[in-house]
Amino acid sequence: MRNIGFISLVVAFLASCTSNGTTAPELTPFPEVSEPIAITQGPKDHLFASYYGINSWSPDNRYVTVLETDIIDRLSEDGEYATIGLIDLQDNNKFIPVAKTCCWNFQEAAMCHWLPWADDTFLYNDKREGKFVTVILNWKTGEEKIIPYPVSAVSRDGEWAVSINYARLRLSRPDYGYAGGGQDAMKDVSWPENDGLWLVNLKTGEAELIVSIASLKDQMTQMQDPKGLAYFCHTIISPNAKKIFWLARTVENLDAQAGFVSKWQTTSFTCDLDGGNVRRCFPDGWGGSHFNWKDDQTLAVTAKWEDRVYGHTIFTVGEEDKVQHIGAGILDFDGHCLFSPDGKFMSSDGYFNEYFERSWVMIRLEDQAVMPIGAFYVPEIYRNTYTRCDLHPRFRPDGAQIGFNSVHEGSRQVYIRNIEWK
């Protein structure tokens, strides 16, 4: 990591004094963030076992879920397994292998989530008997429960999950899908009636299609290509488990994009947990890319502000017309939005720049001041879009640590940083 100075402040959009010379309210100090501490090491590559923003720490904060793989510079194929392991933070970062999965990728890994309603238990996606499923595993006893739907998002209470079609995603966005045909990709149906968002009860295994792809045809970008595909991806459930945010996309000319799909159109949506009250988040042209819930009603989404420039936005569901452009100019990039547990700060990291460095900043939401907290070099072997190593940060639930993936020391490994809040 290039040391860019912890206390340097890039910009503050609000002055420290008001226009009439009176002193403004005292601002919350930025936290101290330690240098990165590697918790995995080679020769194999490692990454957190889930997408950014998802908690990887066990309830007692002793273990962290990671993925281990020999594959470096290509997508995995059907039957190629990665190892799911636990890093024991109290035993010299010992790697404990606990499961294997062939449903994984370099972006979302295997979508591991700890379940608060069962001791020593987490879930992950896998392929069993030819089908993509969720495995609920007690890693100490080895006891498993199979849910016949792969998860895309899990509620904080661990009771609900959203499932999408990862086989269709392998066609339309290969770096986020799974190989092996464990679901019907419906590749000959542009707007399927029987595919979309599935709400899954993780305790009973029951599931219901709550929003079909076809039902949103009139609200999504239209396609001229008869072989084009509409699909859903990237879902997240609100903290109180009452709302869902997701991205709906259309992609055309897949034959011409064979081997590297890079052009699609995005529409951002929210709905209630039961699929009701579907709302578009933005006007035409804004799209949507990365996102996170700040609280039960407020979202941050990187989108194309006024159809001009990608930036960070914050809005309240139901008041989308009051959307705010955060850090205009400084934060005009497509970053992974991540809120501190108290909601006062937002972390964001972007794609690598012309110097092949991934920058990482912390934003104080009170005044939109921005502080750099890192810049991480990307070696050539990790610059491919499909096998890239995004930082994909995630806070420990108590905010005392933040973890991320990085290749700045030559291989894909997992790091944590200690945080001291003031």
Regions from the PLM with identified roles:
Residues 50-53, 71, 76-127:
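Blade-loop segments of beta-propeller domains
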Residues 309-311, 327-369:
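Loop/turn-rich, solvent-exposed surfaces of beta-rich toroidal or solenoidal domains
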Residues 37-46, 97-106, 205-228, 372-385:
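Surface-exposed loop and turn segments in beta-propeller and other repeat-based domains
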Residues 54-65, 104-127, 152-160, 164, ...:
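Blade-terminus and WD-like Trp-Asp/Gly-His loop motifs, strongest in beta-propeller folds
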Residues 37-82:
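Beta-strand-rich domains and repeat architectures in extracellular enzymes and scaffolds
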Residues 103-196, 210-226:
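Asp-box/WD-like beta-propeller blade repeats and closely related beta-sheet repeat scaffolds
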Residues 67-81, 164-194, 246-264, 304-307, ...:
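Short, conserved, GDST-rich strand-edge loop motifs in beta-rich repeat architectures
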Residues 285-287, 327-338, 369-394:
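Conserved blade-ending motifs and adjacent loop-strand segments that build the rim/top face
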